[in-house]
Amino acid sequence: MKRTAIEAAKKAILAWLDDADPFRTHGPHVPAKIRRELGLEKAVFDQAVMELLQARKIYCAPHDHPHRLPEAERAELVADGRGVFYCSISDRRPARPLPAEAIPA
């Protein structure tokens, strides 16, 4: 797996979060949806997510019982390679300020 592909995937994931949820009000997000919309290979996506998690840019919720899922469903989760599977992604970066018209008077 090329480092450049992982770095590009990390940027794409953060850009997707910025576009989909700029005010950080709609998370958590489903990893498989993000991966499909970005057209990323699973291995590259999973590694990029793990690096963003380690850098504390995102939060990922671990699935409580991933091995009870059918293999096809488990394959949709983010795998850390050590037996932990993540079922959601939330942005930990600061939100953009709300527009003035969105704030009640």
Where are the language model's segments positioned?
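Positively charged, polyanion-binding regions of nucleic-acid-associated proteins
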Residues: 4-27, 31-32, 49
